[in-house]
Amino acid sequence: MTNTSTDIISGLEQYADSEGPRIDLNSLYDDGNNEIVLLGVGNILLTDEGLGVHVVKELKESFTFTPAISIIDGGTMGMELLTYMRGMKKILLVDAINGGEAPGTIYEFPHKELEQYFTEHISVHEVGMQDILRIRAIQEDPLEDAVVIGVEPESLEIGFEPSAPVQRVLPEVKERVLRVLQEWGVTAEFNT
C-alpha cells in the first residue's frame, strides 16, 4: 500500500479529531534518577512499530511500581534518550523486532544475548540503540542487567493501532515485562 502525503495528513487530521486515546508524552517521562528503566521505543503512527510505546503506556496507566522505576516513552528519539538514562543500572527495552519469524512472534533477549540483538540490527528503528547504550556505558558504570522484549511486526504502514497478530500477544508481552521487573525486585500493584 502506497500512501501519499495527502493520505498521511488526512489520517493525522482524523486521528487528531477522533475521541480515541491520547498519549501525553510528558506523563511518560518519570524522574530519571531511578536505577531501573522501562523503555518503550517506536513510532505510534506506524501500526506495529509503536508496540514499545503502547506497552509502556499501558503498564504505566495500570500499575504502581515499588521501588519506583523510570518509565520512558522513547518514541523515535535518538541520542536524547541518554538524558533519561543517567544513573540507570538496569534497562528493559520493549521494541518491534524483525527476526524473520511469523508476525506476533515474541522475542526475549537477556543481557548476554544483547550483542546479537544489536549486531544484527533487527530492531525496526533506524535509531541506533546499540550506540546509545555503548555511549552510556562509556559515560557511566556498565549496566548490571538489560533485557529486550520485542514482537515480530506484521505491518509498518500508517495506522494508529497494532495489527491483529501483535494485539493478540500484547498481554503476554506485558506479563513478560512484569516478570523481568519482579526478577529485579520490583513489585507491580494494580491501580484500582
PLM region spans:
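Short "lid" loop at the C-terminus of a central beta-strand within the Rossmann-like core
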Residues: E154
